[in-house]
Amino acid sequence: MENKSREDINLSPVSKIEIYSFFDPFSSDCFKLSAILSKLRIEYNQYIRIRHILNPSLKVLTKCQAQSTSNFDNIALAYKAAELQGRVRAERFIHLMQNEIIPKRDIITESMICDCIQNAGIDLEVFKDDLQKSKLTESLKIDLHIAREMEIEQAPSLVFFSEDVHEEGLKVEGLYPYHIYTYIINELMGKPIEKNLPPKLETYIQQQQLVTMEELLTIYEWPEKLLNKELKKLAIQQKIEKLKYPDGDFWKSKMPKIKSK
């Protein structure tokens, strides 16, 4: 863990803790961290703001280029184009993409990106137009500048900032247990804070559409036996179905998806 400054990056201060999350879309550790970030967002929503940045390192961008045949199936450019329709939708898009490429070990295709774009509530035609804009490359350069200023060398990496823009941020590289991140948030807030409860299991799966067992265990902290029992109930009610992939079991919602705001 290291202290990093954002004073030279020309970023405006906010009234809550800002967390910069640098991720590699092909990294299983980044995929696992997304469950932890979802839990943080649920429990500490009024205290934190999370900004996801695709780590624009040469290694990551080379992987994005190697997986693509055009701009359309280049996940780095696709993510930046998705961001133009809102960060929440862009984060939803990348979560759906990771659900496709990590557990299934799939190659990225145009049809996969189209499906994830639409499931994230993003206008597909506008997205296609945005993909042709040169400003996407400029946006990646800005992300690269931010990553260099914060000395990001690996993904996942999180950088925590308090509301004082002149204070140094705390950089956390790699993947840690959930309580490490909650400890940092509580220390930065400097006062007792109340946690929110997670939504009903059914609601969460409906929101996410596809979830891992590990993700649900992280969010709800139930005994695995109890969680399996509740999942089977939802499966019997035809609300979810179990999918088996090389990297483990997933649960997919059969309920109408909740539209992104």
UniProtKB/Swiss-Prot annotation:
Annotated TM spans: none
Subcellular location: Cytoplasm
Superkingdom of source: Bacteria
A UniProt-annotated Pfam family: Thioredoxin_5
UniProtKB keywords: Cytoplasm
Keyword Cytoplasm carried by entry: yes
GO cellular component labels: cytoplasm
Subunit structure: Interacts with Spx.
Family of this protein: Belongs to the SpxH family.
Stated role: Adapter protein required for efficient degradation of Spx by ClpXP under non-stress conditions. Interaction with Spx stabilizes Spx and exposes the C-terminus of Spx for recognition and proteolysis by ClpXP.
The name this protein goes by in its record: ClpXP adapter protein SpxH
Organism whose genome encodes this protein: Staphylococcus aureus
